[in-house]
Amino acid sequence: MRNFVKKMWSDVVLGVLFVVSGFVKAVDPVGLSYKIEEYLGMFQLSGWSMFSMSLSVLLCASEMTLGLLLLLRLWRRITAVTVTLFILGFTILTYLIYTDPYGGINECGCFGEALHLSNGATFAKNILLLVVAGLHLWNVFRQAKNNFNYRQIGLTVGVLVVAFFVPLYSYFYFFYVINFYLISH
């Protein structure tokens, strides 16, 4: 049991974190697209705001996919590298927000509307997660072998379908069901 815990703790911690974060954002992809527009405005990239909804769905699906791949222990090396790069990117982004002299963004939106963290708390969380991801990356490259099988492909396709279904369902439900209901009544 101890060996199992030593090998699996980082998979579980990072996997649950990515699945929860991605799912909470996927429940309201429109709200996340507004947050992405704030980030684009902060970096003087407002011209890219037309892609904010697509980026929102892609971010939700990517986070849920990576989390499920971690929990299912699929494509371990590729997943470990990708998760570490994601967390490194988020850490750099939160550092830029935390040190922004104008304070344009008050809250990162890491967990959607479920949990609000200050920029300092978000930066500290990302530093801690970067350490965990680095340890996970080191353990995976030390332990994992490149075993290819068709089960991994099937499970990965299933994970991608689930990960893209949730934000797209939320988006289409919001725009078509809610808007048509409001228009007709």
Residue ranges and their predicted role:
Residues S10-D11, L17, G31-F141:
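Hydrophobic alpha-helical segments
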Residues N147-I178:
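Internal/C-terminal transmembrane anchor helices
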Residues F23-D28, P101, F172-V177:
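Helix-to-loop transition at the C-terminal end of transmembrane segments
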Residues N3-K25:
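N-terminal signal-anchor transmembrane alpha helix
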Residues V19-S21, I87-Y95, V161-Y169:
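Aromatic-anchored segments of alpha-helical transmembrane domains
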Residues M1-R2, K6, L137-N146:
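Membrane-interface junctions at the ends of membrane-embedded or membrane-associated helices
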